[in-house]
UniProtKB/Swiss-Prot annotation:
Protein family (similarity comment): Belongs to the PNP synthase family.
GO CC entries: cytosol
Binding site for 3-amino-2-oxopropyl phosphate: N7, R18, S192, G213, H214
Chain sites annotated for binding 1-deoxy-D-xylulose 5-phosphate: D9, H10, R45, H50, T100
Name of the featured protein: Pyridoxine 5'-phosphate synthase
Length: 241
């Protein structure tokens, strides 16, 4: 069984486009849970381009599965997370001008900052995941800072220019998932996964959970959110069958 974390960021993107109170990310999260989501992922960005603090506060009380809060490693976000106490937090890199996440967290370069954040969050009872590129040195650093979970960045795989390049990225993800799993980490994966590229990632036996959002929200425009979630969950389970 491989778990699906549904990222609801881009339901909030549509809401923020006009500053209305619809579509509701809260409603989307509850529908996703009813449709097979094992967790709800939401990224509280520093620029609040989509998810707002209020969304996190409300959902923390309403979710029946798990909240996986994504955030940058900043004092503001770590303090907020320690107050809200999501089940999981995934620490991600952020650049204000980025269109979306561009790569994994550089745990090596920001070792002391990430280590201190991991300690604070763990002491607050929150399970810490680090969003990293599929590289052994970053995985080793994640272990050294005490994170029990990593999320492998699948963006380079998803955005590969040729099928050969995509196959090479897939092999890297496969080998790094096995590397991390053999060293005691829970291995998740995500970013830019969709209905045509998820199966090979879901097939990797060491991967416990996929976090997928943009593609589900996009498909929901045509078939509804419940069906879009169900289809992705089914696709993932079939990959493991
Ligand atoms: C870390 C990651 O890949 C996503 O979970 C992240 O939320 C992407 O950022 P946007 O949702 O703002 O595109
Ligand atoms: N961490 C990846 C995630 O939560 C969803 O990313 P995407 O599917 O919106 O690209």
């Amino acid at each position: 069984m491989i778990a699906l974390g549904v990222n609801i960021d881009h339901v909030a993107t549509l809401r923020q486009a006009r500053g209305t109170d619809y579509p509701s990310p809260i409603k989307a999260a509850l529908v996703a849970e009813e449709s097979g989501a094992d967790a709800i992922t939401l990224h509280l960005r520093e620029d609040r381009r989509h998810i707002q603090e209020e969304d996190v506060i409300i959902l923390r009380e309403r979710l029946k599965t798990r909240m996986n809060l994504e955030s940058a490693v900043t004092e503001e976000m770590i303090s907020f997370a320690c107050r809200i106490k999501p089940h999981d937090i995934c620490l991600v890199p952020e650049r204000r001008e980025e269109l979306t996440t561009e790569g994994g967290l550089d745990v090596i370069r920001h070792f002391d900052q990430v280590s201190a954040a991991c300690k604070r969050l763990t002491e607050a009872g929150i399970r810490v995941s680090l969003f990293v590129d599929a590289r052994a040195d970053q995985i080793d650093a994640a272990i050294r800072v005490g994170a029990p979970v990593i999320e492998l960045h699948t963006g380079h795989y998803a955005d590969a220019a040729t099928s050969e390049a995509q196959q090479a990225e897939l092999e890297t993800i496969r080998s790094m998932a096995a590397y991390a799993f053999s060293r005691g980490l829970q291995v998740n994966a995500g970013h830019s996964l969709h209905y045509q590229n998820t199966t090979p990632i879901a097939f990797i036996p060491e991967i416990t959970e996929l976090n997928i959002g943009h593609a589900i929200v996009a498909r929901a425009l045509f078939i509804g959110f419940a069906q879009a979630v169900r289809e992705m969950k089914t696709l993932m389970q079939e990959a493991r069958a």
